[in-house]
Regions:
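Core catalytic region of metal-dependent phosphoesterases/phosphodiesterases
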Residues: 2-4, 11, 15-116, 170-174
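Structural motif
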Residues: 5-7, 46, 123, 142-146, ...
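Active-site flanking residues adjacent to catalytic metal/cofactor-binding acidic residues
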Residues: 9, 48-50, 84-85, 145, ...
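Histidine-centered catalytic micro-motifs
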Residues: 10-13, 144-149, 175-185
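Hydrophobic/aromatic residues located in beta-strands of well-ordered beta-sheets
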Residues: 45, 80-82, 121, 141, ...
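Glycine-rich nucleotide phosphate-binding loop and flanking beta-alpha elements
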Residues: 53, 130, 151, 184-186
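Conserved catalytic scaffold of divalent metal-dependent phosphoesterases
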Residues: 66, 84, 88-169, 194-197
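Conserved small/polar residues in nucleotide/adenosyl-binding loops
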Residues: 199-201
Length: 201
């Protein structure tokens, strides 16, 4: 699927009431990310969900910053994969309406909106309904997703309680799992929450 990939997550364009400062910080981060990816020989890129912050609407200045950033990513990688996080979805329990659907029209961008596996890599958007049942059955060595797993820190102080069906033990077939969603960088066994792209204060 790829030789070497650069990965980031949870950039949340449009945060702080569509703050121009925040969106500019996001764009500057994208420039830095591309530079680092080139320096480290990454021909592919992956974004692990929550591109936008607001689930209900998109501000035009935020949309403009988003398009500029995705066009940069599409033109600087052989392939750049993006999948939906919960903040990208209009409904939390289904993925039919989301704020990054337009990205599939940008050259170089591959939008993943369903469980996808190629070779030894799986790309998994925000899970809905009983899709969690696919995780224990998946044999991919590497899995990238936007998972809400118990006993990981939701922030610096509070751990996610046990609720829902998905558990850490369901990832028994994966050597490495990389996830967005929780903003604190942390690891338990084979599961890595890669943390914030930049500090959202």
């Amino acid at each position: 699927m790829f030789k070497k990939a650069a990965v980031f997550t949870d950039i949340h364009f449009g945060l702080k009431g569509n703050s121009k400062t925040h969106n500019l910080d996001c764009e500057n981060f994208i420039d830095w990310f591309i530079e680092q990816a080139h320096e480290h020989g990454c021909e592919s890129g992956i974004f692990c969900g929550d591109w936008h912050h607001n689930r209900n609407h998109l501000n035009l200045t935020t949309m403009s910053a988003t398009i500029r950033s995705l066009e940069k990513l599409g033109s600087n990688f052989d392939n750049f994969f993006i999948f939906t996080g919960n903040h990208d979805l209009y409904y939390k329990d289904k993925r039919d309406i989301h704020s990054v659907n337009f990205s599939r029209h940008i050259p170089g961008i591959t939008l993943i909106n369903d469980f996808y596996q190629e070779d030894d890599v799986a790309l998994v958007p925000w899970l809905v309904d009983d899709e969690w049942k696919k995780i224990p059955e998946c044999k991919a060595k590497y899995m990238f997703g936007h998972f809400e797993l118990p006993n990981f820190y939701m922030n610096a102080m509070v751990k996610m309680p046990e609720h829902g069906e998905l558990r850490n033990t369901h990832f028994k077939n994966q050597e490495y799992v990389f996830s967005g969603h929780f903003h604190k960088r942390q690891q338990q066994r084979n599961i890595h929450y890669i943390g914030l792209s930049l500090i959202h204060i």
